Regions:
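Short alpha-helix in the alpha/beta-hydrolase fold that links the catalytic acid
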Residues: 79, 88, 102-111
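Catalytic active-site module of serine/aspartate enzymes centered on a nucleophile-bearing elbow/loop
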Residues: 133-151
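Catalytic histidine neighborhood in serine/cysteine hydrolases
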Residues: 110-128
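Gly/Ala-rich beta-loop-alpha elbow adjacent to hydrolase catalytic centers
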Residues: 4-8, 12
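Acidic catalytic loop of the alpha/beta-hydrolase fold
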Residues: 96-101, 128-129
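Active-site nucleophile elbow and catalytic-triad environment of alpha/beta-hydrolase enzymes
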Residues: 65-82, 88
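Short beta-strand/loop motif that positions the catalytic acidic residue
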Residues: 85-86, 92-94, 98
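Hydrolase active-site cap/lid region
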Residues: 14-72
Length: 151
């Protein structure tokens, strides 16, 4: 069982398409992003109110520097690419008022996976606060998912 929140959720999704041990029967992700580049572009726009120009070329330059320094482009850090290879059951959880990792990203992630999947949007929850805002509903969704797919 893999379970992650925020960056941990993105990490869980990024491992989903790998050759994981058979003990990993299912994955739960809570508010993970689609890929690093999309998240940085979103933050530049929302936090810094940066317009498309110069945001686009700056993120591309940053991606190139990242490639030189650590060996990969920002787009390579992609949950979506790994989810295309996933065949394990997944529960996707996201806050409906998430401004840090926009809620729209969960729909892209959800559509990308090949395994059995469930989606729960915690309507009024901001980033990483679905459990804090809806503890009973959160527990119910997780418990039902685990009962279905993890024996």
């Amino acid at each position: 069982m893999l379970f992650g929140v925020s960056m941990g959720a993105a990490t869980a999704m990024m491992t989903s398409g790998l050759n994981l041990p058979k003990q990993v029967k299912a994955i739960i992700e809570d508010c993970g992003y689609t890929d690093v580049k999309d998240e940085i572009e979103h933050e530049a726009k929302v936090l810094y109110h940066m317009p498309a120009f110069p945001r686009f070329p700056l993120v591309e330059i940053l991606s190139g520097i990242n490639r030189i320094k650590v060996g990969y482009y920002l787009k390579d850090g992609s949950s979506v690419n790994q989810l295309h290879r996933n065949h394990r059951p997944m529960l996707f959880i996201h806050g409906g008022r998430d401004k840090f990792v926009p809620t729209r990203m969960v729909y892209t992630n959800y559509e990308a996976t090949k395994g059995k999947k469930e989606l729960w949007i915690a309507k009024k929850a901001p980033h990483a606060a679905s459990y804090a805002n809806y503890p009973q509903a959160y527990t119910k969704h997780v418990r039902n998912f685990l009962n279905k797919y993890v024996h």
